[in-house]
């Protein structure tokens, strides 16, 4: 009996095997060979068991300690962030930097503005300034109009708009010169006679930034007055012609009256 008890005590219990994160881990039982483990003394007089299948713990080099003792400065982070911001700002400036307009392109722009008028930037870009897009033409026009509406500023740097605008003022008629021209008479030939009609010059080539509301209103009033005058003259001629025709019908011709008198006799 004693021998059986000693054999049972010596018989190792089966090890407990479980899987942890895909790795089989043995524990619990005494069936693990003692040869696989060896004791190693570490600092402080402590002993740990390590497996022979694992790499030597003492062969692992300690992590290098930085010169500043592991202390990071906040200024380093701020310098890094400022450097990144400067690079981004430089890239944005390079992207936004465009090619300046030449004098020839600006002259073509003024010619297109004179013929097509303000607002047709797509037509100016397509037919006149072909080297620029419609968006670029609209931006250039905005700068041009701002420059023209504020011409009296002192100590202002010379610009392309000023140089070309002086050359192109002779081609663009001013609203004062167009509005003060005397009206011309157009004669309409009719069956009842010649009818004179007053005609005012058509306001073409006006620049949108220099035309005043009062001048446009006065111009429209003159056109309306001339139209009313022409209609009244035409209606007067029609009434006169109708009255003349009625008189001709009511009055008998003289030879008809003589023939009637002869018959009576």
From Swiss-Prot:
Q: What is this protein called?
A: Transcription factor MYBS2
Give a yes or no for keyword Transcription in this entry: yes
Q: Name one Pfam family in it.
A: Myb_DNA-binding
Any idea what job this protein has? Transcription activator that binds to 5'-TATCCA-3' elements in gene promoters. Derepresses weakly the sugar-repressed transcription of promoters containing SRS. Contributes to the sugar-repressed transcription of promoters containing 5'-TATCCA-3' elements.
Q: What induces it?
A: Induced by sucrose. Slightly repressed by gibberellic acid (GA).
Q: Name one GO cellular component term.
A: nucleus
Q: Which UniProt keywords apply?
A: Activator, DNA-binding, Nucleus, Transcription, Transcription regulation
Q: In which tissues is it expressed?
A: Expressed mainly in roots, leaves, and senescent leaves at similar levels.
* Species: Oryza sativa subsp. japonica
Q: Which gene specifies this protein's sequence?
A: MYBS2
Q: At which positions is motif Nuclear localization signal? A: 71-78
């Amino acid at each position: 009996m004693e021998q059986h008890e000693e054999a049972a005590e010596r018989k190792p219990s089966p090890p407990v095997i479980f899987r942890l994160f895909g790795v089989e881990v043995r524990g619990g039982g005494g069936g693990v060979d003692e040869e696989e483990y060896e004791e190693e003394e570490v600092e402080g007089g402590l002993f740990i068991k390590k497996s022979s299948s694992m790499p030597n713990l003492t062969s692992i080099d300690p992590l290098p300690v930085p010169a500043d003792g592991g202390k990071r400065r906040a200024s380093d982070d701020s310098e890094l962030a400022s450097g990144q911001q400067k690079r981004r700002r430089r890239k944005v400036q390079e992207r936004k930097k465009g090619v300046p307009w030449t004098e020839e392109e600006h002259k073509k722009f003024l010619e297109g503005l004179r013929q097509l008028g303000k607002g047709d930037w797509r037509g100016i870009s397509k037919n006149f300034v072909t080297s620029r897009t419609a968006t670029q033409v609209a931006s250039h026009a905005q700068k041009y109009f701002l420059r023209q509406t504020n011409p009296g500023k002192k100590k202002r740097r010379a610009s392309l708009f000023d140089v070309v605008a002086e050359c192109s003022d002779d081609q663009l008629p001013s609203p004062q010169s167009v509005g003060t021209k005397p009206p011309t008479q157009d004669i309409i030939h009719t069956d009842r006679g010649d009818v004179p009609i007053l005609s005012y010059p058509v306001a073409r080539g006006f620049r949108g930034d220099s035309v005043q509301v009062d001048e446009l209103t006065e111009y429209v009033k003159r056109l309306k007055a001339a139209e009313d005058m022409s209609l009244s003259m035409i209606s007067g001629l029609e009434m006169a012609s109708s009255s003349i025709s009625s008189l001709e019908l009511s009055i008998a011709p003289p030879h008809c009256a003589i023939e009637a008198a002869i018959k009576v006799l």
